[in-house]
Structures are given as C-alpha cells and as structure tokens.
C-alpha cells in the first residue's frame, strides 16, 4: 500500500503517540493502513469548529494499539458546506455511531455512510448545535402542550444575532485553546 506523502503530514510528539494530518482523498486508505499496522481500535471520532478557518471543521480520529501501547490521532479539515468526508465504516464498524454524532452536532456529511441520520437531537431539529455561530437559544423551542396533548415547536425570538469570539485579554491561552494533539507551540 502506498500513501501519497504530499497528502499526509505526520508528527510524532511523544513516545508512542503520533499526529497525522490527512487530505480527504487519503483518509480511508490511511485509516486502513494504520489498522493493518496494529491500530486495531477506533476509540473516537469528533469534530472541532475553528470558526476563523476556511475549512472550519476539523474531524479527528483517535486510534489505539493496545499491544504496543501506541496512540495515533488522524486529523482532516473540511468545509461542511461544500465537502464530504469519506466514511470509515468499512474499516471500523464502530465508526457508524461516531460519524452520525459528528454529522448531528457539526453538519459534516460522511459520503458512503450506511445510515447517516441524527443520533442525539430530535429529527426535526434545525441546525447543528456545536457550531460556534449556532445561537445559544437554538431556533425553536420544543415543549409539550397539555391542552392539545402533543409536542409543539415554536420559533424562538433571537435577541442576539451573532456572538463575537475575539477576546482582548492578557491571560495566556484564552485566545487560542491548547490542543494536546497539536504539535505547534504557542
């Protein structure tokens, strides 16, 4: 198996730990290769919203090699409005649930997923609640109406259109959260 090194950037930041930045095109091949190299357990897939980036969502895959006590973090950046992430369900079946959660919270579409639908929020939920520009109150209020004996959805009056995340503070680390899997120094 040959992985195009122009599409993968790796960093070993501690003994037994590595971070790999991948392109969308190489992702499934890379995950499959790592699986055949002993990383037999996919422990999590999650998203991080970097509002200021062009490709604002970073999808992170955490792989574990129990025999050699190694961990590998694979990252791929995506613009959920225009790009789809290839599913890894063919390599790790547990990816099914993790990918559904990332879709539900961040709106990232996983191409080829066998059952991509919401898993944590209501099926009529609008938007993706973990995005930094999602309103704190949501778009609709859901409540049970005793008179009609049914669930009622009511539009919420948004008093705050947009939250600004720029912070002029002297405190270290407030402007940019630290990422234990990031090899860059502050």
From Swiss-Prot:
Domain of life of the source: Bacteria
A single MF term (Gene Ontology): NADH:ubiquinone reductase (non-electrogenic) activity
The keyword Ligase is annotated on this UniProt entry: no
InterPro entries (alphabetical): NADH_DH_suC, NADH_quin_OxRdtase_su_C/D-like, NADH_UbQ_OxRdtase_30kDa_su, NADH_UbQ_OxRdtase_CS
UniProt keyword Cell membrane, yes or no: yes
One cellular component (GO) term of this entry: plasma membrane
Main localisation: membrane
EC id: 7.1.1.-
Stretches the record annotates as Disordered: 166-186
Catalytic activity: a quinone + NADH + 5 H(+)(in) = a quinol + NAD(+) + 4 H(+)(out)
Subcellular localization(s) per the UniProt record: Cell inner membrane
Bilayer topology term: Peripheral membrane protein
Alphabetic keyword roster: Cell inner membrane, Cell membrane, Membrane, NAD, Quinone, Translocase, Transport, Ubiquinone
Pfam families hit by this protein: Complex1_30kDa (PF00329)
Record HAMAP family: NDH1_NuoC
Quaternary structure annotation from Swiss-Prot or TrEMBL: NDH-1 is composed of 14 different subunits. Subunits NuoB, C, D, E, F, and G constitute the peripheral sector of the complex.
UniProt record similarity statement: Belongs to the complex I 30 kDa subunit family.
Function recorded in the entry: NDH-1 shuttles electrons from NADH, via FMN and iron-sulfur (Fe-S) centers, to quinones in the respiratory chain. The immediate electron acceptor for the enzyme in this species is believed to be ubiquinone. Couples the redox reaction to proton translocation (for every two electrons transferred, four hydrogen ions are translocated across the cytoplasmic membrane), and thus conserves the redox energy in a proton gradient.
Annotated protein name in UniProt: NADH-quinone oxidoreductase subunit C
Organism: Neorickettsia sennetsu (strain ATCC VR-367 / Miyayama) (Ehrlichia sennetsu)
């Amino acid at each position: 198996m040959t992985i195009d090194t122009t599409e993968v950037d790796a960093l070993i930041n501690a003994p037994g730990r590595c971070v790999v930045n991948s392109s969308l095109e190489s992702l499934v091949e890379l995950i499959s290769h790592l699986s055949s190299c002993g990383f037999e357990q996919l422990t999590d897939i999650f998203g991080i919203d970097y509002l200021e980036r062009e490709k604002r969502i970073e999808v992170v895959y955490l792989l574990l090699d129990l025999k050699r006590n190694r961990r590998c973090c694979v990252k791929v950046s995506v613009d959920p409005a225009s790009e789809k992430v290839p599913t890894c369900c063919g390599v790790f079946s547990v990816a099914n649930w993790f990918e559904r959660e990332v879709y539900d919270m961040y709106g990232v579409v996983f191409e080829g997923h066998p059952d991509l639908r919401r898993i944590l929020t209501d099926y009529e939920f609008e938007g993706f609640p973990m995005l930094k520009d999602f309103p704190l109150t949501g778009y609709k209020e859901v409540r049970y109406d005793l008179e009609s004996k049914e669930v009622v959805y009511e539009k919420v009056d948004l008093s705050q259109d947009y939250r600004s995340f720029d912070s002029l503070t002297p405190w270290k680390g407030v402007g940019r959260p630290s990422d234990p899997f990031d090899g860059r120094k502050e």
